[in-house]
Protein backbone atom coordinates (compact mmCIF):
# COMPACT_ATOMS: atom_id res chain seq x y z
CA UNK A 1 0.00 0.00 0.00
CA UNK A 2 1.44 3.33 -1.02
CA UNK A 3 1.76 6.05 1.58
CA UNK A 4 0.26 9.43 0.89
CA UNK A 5 2.90 12.11 0.31
CA UNK A 6 2.09 15.37 2.06
CA UNK A 7 5.02 17.45 0.90
CA UNK A 8 5.07 19.12 -2.48
CA UNK A 9 8.49 19.04 -4.13
CA UNK A 10 9.28 21.04 -7.22
CA UNK A 11 12.53 20.44 -9.07
CA UNK A 12 13.20 23.57 -11.10
CA UNK A 13 15.63 24.08 -13.93
CA UNK A 14 14.08 27.04 -15.72
CA UNK A 15 11.99 30.02 -14.72
CA UNK A 16 8.63 28.44 -15.49
CA UNK A 17 9.26 25.04 -17.01
CA UNK A 18 10.47 21.60 -16.05
CA UNK A 19 13.19 21.49 -18.67
CA UNK A 20 16.91 20.92 -18.29
CA UNK A 21 19.72 22.97 -19.75
CA UNK A 22 22.05 21.23 -22.13
CA UNK A 23 25.20 20.05 -20.39
CA UNK A 24 25.20 20.76 -16.68
CA UNK A 25 21.71 21.30 -15.29
CA UNK A 26 21.33 24.31 -13.03
CA UNK A 27 18.44 24.93 -10.67
CA UNK A 28 17.16 24.17 -7.21
CA UNK A 29 14.80 21.91 -5.34
CA UNK A 30 11.90 23.74 -3.68
CA UNK A 31 9.71 22.41 -0.87
CA UNK A 32 6.65 24.64 -1.04
CA UNK A 33 5.23 23.39 2.25
CA UNK A 34 8.27 24.16 4.39
CA UNK A 35 9.41 27.11 2.25
CA UNK A 36 12.84 25.56 1.82
CA UNK A 37 15.00 25.70 -1.29
CA UNK A 38 18.12 23.56 -1.69
CA UNK A 39 21.04 24.26 -4.03
CA UNK A 40 23.41 21.32 -4.42
CA UNK A 41 26.41 21.65 -6.73
CA UNK A 42 27.06 17.92 -6.61
CA UNK A 43 23.68 16.85 -8.01
CA UNK A 44 23.59 19.55 -10.69
CA UNK A 45 21.13 21.83 -8.89
CA UNK A 46 23.88 24.19 -7.91
CA UNK A 47 22.66 27.63 -8.90
CA UNK A 48 21.70 29.83 -5.93
CA UNK A 49 20.37 32.57 -8.20
CA UNK A 50 18.06 30.06 -9.87
CA UNK A 51 16.70 29.10 -6.44
CA UNK A 52 15.98 32.78 -5.78
CA UNK A 53 14.36 33.17 -9.20
CA UNK A 54 12.15 30.15 -8.57
CA UNK A 55 11.01 31.57 -5.24
CA UNK A 56 10.21 34.83 -7.01
CA UNK A 57 8.24 32.96 -9.66
CA UNK A 58 6.27 31.16 -6.98
CA UNK A 59 4.89 34.53 -5.88
CA UNK A 60 5.43 34.16 -2.12
CA UNK A 61 8.73 35.84 -1.29
CA UNK A 62 8.44 35.87 2.50
CA UNK A 63 9.94 33.42 4.99
CA UNK A 64 12.12 31.17 2.83
CA UNK A 65 15.28 29.31 3.81
CA UNK A 66 17.80 28.59 1.05
CA UNK A 67 20.14 25.77 2.06
CA UNK A 68 23.49 25.60 0.28
CA UNK A 69 25.06 22.16 0.14
CA UNK A 70 28.83 21.64 0.14
CA UNK A 71 30.31 22.86 -3.16
CA UNK A 72 31.31 25.98 -5.09
CA UNK A 73 28.74 28.51 -6.30
CA UNK A 74 28.51 31.86 -8.08
CA UNK A 75 27.43 35.15 -6.53
CA UNK A 76 23.73 36.01 -6.36
CA UNK A 77 21.24 38.85 -5.85
CA UNK A 78 18.27 38.80 -3.48
CA UNK A 79 15.69 41.32 -4.79
CA UNK A 80 14.33 44.20 -2.72
CA UNK A 81 10.83 42.72 -2.41
CA UNK A 82 12.03 39.61 -0.52
CA UNK A 83 11.39 39.39 3.24
CA UNK A 84 12.68 37.19 6.06
CA UNK A 85 15.07 35.16 3.91
CA UNK A 86 17.90 33.00 5.27
CA UNK A 87 20.72 31.72 3.06
CA UNK A 88 22.53 29.05 5.06
CA UNK A 89 25.61 27.13 3.98
CA UNK A 90 26.82 23.70 4.95
CA UNK A 91 30.48 23.14 5.77
CA UNK A 92 32.65 23.67 2.66
CA UNK A 93 30.02 25.69 0.80
CA UNK A 94 31.96 28.41 -1.03
CA UNK A 95 30.53 31.41 -2.88
CA UNK A 96 32.99 32.81 -5.43
CA UNK A 97 31.85 36.39 -5.80
CA UNK A 98 34.45 37.87 -8.09
CA UNK A 99 35.79 36.96 -11.49
CA UNK A 100 38.31 39.54 -12.68
CA UNK A 101 37.62 38.68 -16.32
CA UNK A 102 34.08 40.07 -16.08
CA UNK A 103 34.87 43.06 -13.89
CA UNK A 104 34.15 45.55 -16.68
CA UNK A 105 30.57 44.27 -16.97
CA UNK A 106 29.58 44.77 -13.33
CA UNK A 107 26.80 47.27 -12.65
CA UNK A 108 26.60 46.63 -8.90
CA UNK A 109 29.03 46.13 -6.00
CA UNK A 110 30.35 42.98 -7.64
CA UNK A 111 29.61 40.48 -4.89
CA UNK A 112 26.53 39.12 -3.18
CA UNK A 113 23.70 41.68 -3.34
CA UNK A 114 21.37 41.12 -0.39
CA UNK A 115 18.52 43.58 -0.78
CA UNK A 116 15.20 43.14 1.01
CA UNK A 117 13.98 43.13 4.58
CA UNK A 118 15.51 40.87 7.24
CA UNK A 119 17.96 39.00 5.01
CA UNK A 120 20.35 36.62 6.79
CA UNK A 121 23.55 35.08 5.42
CA UNK A 122 24.77 32.29 7.67
CA UNK A 123 27.65 29.82 7.60
CA UNK A 124 28.99 30.78 4.17
CA UNK A 125 32.56 31.04 2.92
CA UNK A 126 32.58 34.03 0.57
CA UNK A 127 35.69 34.22 -1.59
CA UNK A 128 36.45 37.43 -3.49
CA UNK A 129 39.61 35.95 -4.97
CA UNK A 130 42.13 38.25 -6.61
CA UNK A 131 40.28 41.56 -6.75
CA UNK A 132 41.46 43.73 -9.67
CA UNK A 133 43.29 46.90 -8.68
CA UNK A 134 41.23 49.23 -10.89
CA UNK A 135 38.71 51.29 -8.96
CA UNK A 136 35.06 51.09 -9.94
CA UNK A 137 35.11 47.41 -10.85
CA UNK A 138 34.45 45.61 -7.57
CA UNK A 139 33.53 47.32 -4.31
CA UNK A 140 32.26 44.70 -1.84
CA UNK A 141 32.03 40.96 -1.31
CA UNK A 142 28.63 41.40 0.38
CA UNK A 143 26.46 44.48 -0.04
CA UNK A 144 22.95 45.87 0.20
CA UNK A 145 23.92 49.22 -1.31
CA UNK A 146 21.13 50.21 -3.68
CA UNK A 147 22.48 53.33 -5.34
CA UNK A 148 20.63 56.62 -5.09
CA UNK A 149 17.48 54.83 -3.91
CA UNK A 150 19.18 53.99 -0.64
CA UNK A 151 18.48 51.10 1.67
CA UNK A 152 15.37 52.35 3.47
CA UNK A 153 13.50 49.29 4.72
CA UNK A 154 16.45 46.98 4.13
CA UNK A 155 18.07 44.93 6.88
CA UNK A 156 20.97 42.50 6.55
CA UNK A 157 22.43 40.06 9.05
CA UNK A 158 25.72 38.23 8.45
CA UNK A 159 26.51 35.42 10.89
CA UNK A 160 29.29 32.85 11.19
CA UNK A 161 30.64 33.62 7.72
CA UNK A 162 34.20 33.67 6.40
CA UNK A 163 34.72 36.53 3.95
CA UNK A 164 38.10 36.69 2.29
CA UNK A 165 39.81 38.77 -0.37
CA UNK A 166 43.39 38.89 -1.58
CA UNK A 167 44.88 42.02 -0.03
CA UNK A 168 42.59 44.33 -1.99
CA UNK A 169 42.98 48.07 -1.47
CA UNK A 170 39.82 48.88 -3.42
CA UNK A 171 37.06 46.84 -1.79
CA UNK A 172 35.06 46.13 1.36
CA UNK A 173 34.28 42.82 2.96
CA UNK A 174 30.74 44.00 3.75
CA UNK A 175 29.09 47.24 2.61
CA UNK A 176 25.91 48.15 4.51
CA UNK A 177 23.48 50.71 3.12
CA UNK A 178 20.55 50.11 5.45
CA UNK A 179 19.22 51.14 8.87
CA UNK A 180 19.25 47.51 10.02
CA UNK A 181 22.46 45.44 10.18
CA UNK A 182 24.33 42.80 12.19
CA UNK A 183 27.73 41.16 11.79
CA UNK A 184 28.34 38.38 14.29
CA UNK A 185 31.11 35.81 14.68
CA UNK A 186 32.54 36.33 11.18
CA UNK A 187 36.11 36.14 9.89
CA UNK A 188 36.98 38.90 7.42
CA UNK A 189 40.38 39.25 5.74
CA UNK A 190 42.14 40.76 2.74
CA UNK A 191 40.12 43.93 2.08
CA UNK A 192 40.71 47.66 2.34
CA UNK A 193 37.87 47.88 4.84
CA UNK A 194 36.30 44.93 6.64
CA UNK A 195 32.90 46.56 7.23
CA UNK A 196 31.72 49.87 5.77
CA UNK A 197 28.50 51.70 6.51
CA UNK A 198 26.81 53.86 3.89
CA UNK A 199 23.79 56.09 4.48
CA UNK A 200 21.45 57.00 1.64
CA UNK A 201 18.25 58.81 2.65
CA UNK A 202 17.72 57.16 6.05
CA UNK A 203 18.76 57.41 9.69
CA UNK A 204 20.44 54.50 11.48
CA UNK A 205 18.84 53.81 14.89
CA UNK A 206 21.02 54.21 17.97
CA UNK A 207 20.16 50.70 19.17
CA UNK A 208 19.21 47.35 17.68
CA UNK A 209 22.25 46.88 15.44
CA UNK A 210 25.33 44.91 16.43
CA UNK A 211 28.85 44.13 15.22
CA UNK A 212 30.38 41.63 17.63
CA UNK A 213 32.57 38.56 17.96
CA UNK A 214 34.31 39.06 14.62
CA UNK A 215 37.92 38.44 13.61
CA UNK A 216 39.50 40.93 11.18
CA UNK A 217 42.96 40.61 9.68
CA UNK A 218 44.93 41.94 6.69
CA UNK A 219 42.53 44.86 6.26
CA UNK A 220 43.53 48.54 6.28
CA UNK A 221 40.45 49.41 8.34
CA UNK A 222 38.11 47.33 10.46
Segment roles from a protein language model:
Residues 12-20:
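Bacterial N-terminal signal peptides
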Residues 21-31:
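Sec-dependent signal peptide cleavage junction
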Residues 29-67:
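Acidic Gly/Asp/Thr-rich repetitive segments characteristic of extracellular carbohydrate-active
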Residues 49, 53-58, 74-88, 95-154, ...:
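Extracellular beta-strand-rich solenoid/capping regions of secreted or surface-exposed proteins
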Amino acid sequence: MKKKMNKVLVVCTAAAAMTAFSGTAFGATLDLESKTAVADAKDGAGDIQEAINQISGNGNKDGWTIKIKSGTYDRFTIPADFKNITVEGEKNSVIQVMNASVADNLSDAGGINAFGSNITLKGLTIDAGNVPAEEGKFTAAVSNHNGAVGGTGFSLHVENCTIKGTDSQFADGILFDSPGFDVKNCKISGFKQAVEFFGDNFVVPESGNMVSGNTVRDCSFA
